[in-house]
C-alpha cells in the first residue's frame, strides 16, 4: 500500500501522535510519503496513484475541491473520529475502499480528542 500524509500542529482541539500511526502502518508494509501538497495527494487517491491519504491541521482551501473529486471517484472519506463529514473538520482520512478499514484503524490509534 502506498499512502501520503500531511501534518500541522497549530491550534488543534485534539492530540495526534503520528509515530503511533507509523508504527502500525509498518506492520501492514505501508510506504508513506509526504508531498507537501494536500490537494494533489487527494487527487492522487482519486486517480488510484495512492491507496490512501490522511492529514490533520488541514485548511479548507487545501482539501475542498479534492474531496469532491475523491468522492466522485469512489474513495471513502472520514475524519479521524470516523465521521464522514470532513468539510467541518481539519483532520481526514481518504482511501480506496480496499484499504480504508486498515488505514483508518492505524490513524485513529494516534488520535485523542481534548474535548
Where are these regions (language model features)?
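An extended, acidic
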Residues: 1-115
Amino acid at each position: 500500500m502506498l499512502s501520503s500524509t500531511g501534518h500541522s500542529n497549530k491550534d488543534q482541539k485534539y492530540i495526534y501522535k503520528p509515530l503511533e500511526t507509523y508504527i502500525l502502518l509498518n506492520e501492514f508494509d505501508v510506504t508513506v510519503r509526504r508531498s507537501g501538497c494536500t490537494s494533489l495527494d487527494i487527487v492522487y487517491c482519486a486517480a488510484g496513484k495512492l491507496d490512501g491519504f490522511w492529514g490533520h491541521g488541514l485548511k479548507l482551501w487545501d482539501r475542498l475541491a479534492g474531496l469532491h473529486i475523491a468522492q466522485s471517484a469512489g474513495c471513502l472519506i472520514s475524519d479521524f473520529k470516523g465521521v464522514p463529514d470532513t468539510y467541518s473538520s481539519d483532520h481526514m482520512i481518504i482511501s480506496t475502499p480496499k484499504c480504508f478499514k486498515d488505514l483508518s484503524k492505524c490513524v485513529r490509534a494516534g488520535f485523542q480528542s481534548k474535548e
